[in-house]
Design a protein with these regions (language model features):
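The catalytic-center signature of Zn2+-dependent metalloproteases
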Residues: 200-247
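Bacterial N-terminal signal peptides that target proteins for export
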Residues: 4-15
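Gram-negative bacterial Sec-dependent N-terminal signal peptides
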Residues: 14-22
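Structural recognition of the beta-strand scaffold that forms the well-ordered cores
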Residues: 79-84, 120-123, 184-188, 217, ...
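Short, well-ordered secondary-structure micro-motifs within conserved domains or adaptor modules
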Residues: 179-193
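Short, surface-exposed beta-strand/loop "edge" segments at domain boundaries and coil↔beta transitions
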Residues: 24-26, 89, 192-201
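Sec-dependent signal peptide cleavage junction
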Residues: 21-38
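Propeptide-to-catalytic entry region of secreted or membrane-anchored zinc metalloproteases
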Residues: 37-177, 191, 209
Length: 247
């Protein structure tokens, strides 16, 4: 039934996140712990060119949907949806360009590159009234998802998460191939500040910063969401070291 389908889909996501998304060898302990570093396991490979599919008509969806990368049926492939925040109606062409550039960049990293034929990527052209991002205790921007900066992290405010969930449901019911579901959502904030976050398996965030111009930050944050990975930084050691060289 529906519950079993969701369970199978989650297993597929875990397989992508743990056994497919990380091509370097693991120790048995690292595999069991599921705490591998997103920094550590994302390995750059030679550049591959992604062929974008022509936009499909989406008259039944609230916002236009742009097909960035589709290689097979949505039910069989892992579906990534990119949504914009802080992009006004006049900036939608820029959003599509930004989302496409970052998604194509992500598909040049292993093992996304090797499994690119099992991944479909779409962009939903959500429209904000104002450009930019709000700051906790500071400026307020009227953006669609009401994203807000909390120090170096990004999060929802004022019900923005429910808006994203509603758009996911709409995609699943009215746009994707029959029986398909969205695997994860990445929200791209129209600000040049260098921020990012992943709050669970469904949502991750990055910005339109120079460091993220080729999707490096997006790849990092999406890997947190799909693989359930923890950071391993010399300056940030609250996660256990689970590298292949650790005891």
């Amino acid at each position: 039934g529906r519950k079993m389908k969701k369970y199978v889909k989650r297993l597929e996501a875990i397989m992508l996140g743990i056994t497919m998304l990380f091509s370097m060898p693991f120790s048995g302990t690292a595999m069991a712990a599921g705490k591998t570093s997103a920094n550590q396991m994302t390995v750059k490979t030679h550049t591959a060119q992604t062929t974008a599919v022509e936009d499909a008509e989406s008259p039944k969806t609230t916002f236009p949907v742009h097909v960035i990368h589709k290689t097979g049926n949505d039910k069989e492939n892992f579906v990534i949806v990119i949504m914009g925040d802080g992009y006004t109606a006049q900036q939608q062409d820029q959003f599509v360009k930004d989302a496409t550039q970052k998604a194509q960049g992500m598909l040049t990293w292993s093992p996304y590159k090797e499994y690119s034929d099992r991944i479909n990527i779409y962009a939903i052209q959500t429209i904000s009234n104002e450009t930019g991002i709000s700051e906790y205790g500071g400026k307020s921007v009227d953006s669609y998802f009401h994203l807000r900066l909390f120090g170096k992290a990004i999060g929802f405010s004022n019900g923005g998460d429910q808006k994203a969930k509603d758009l996911r449901e709409e995609m699943e019911k009215k746009y994707l191939d029959a029986g398909a579901s969205v695997g994860t959502i990445h929200i791209l904030s129209n600000t040049n500040g260098d921020f990012g976050a992943s709050i669970n398996s469904l949502f991750s965030f990055s910005t339109n910063s120079e460091d993220n111009s080729s999707g490096t930050a997006m790849t990092h944050e999406v890997s947190h969401s799909i693989g359930g990975l923890g950071d391993e930084y010399e300056r940030y050691t609250n996660k256990p070291n689970t590298s292949a060289t650790s005891d």
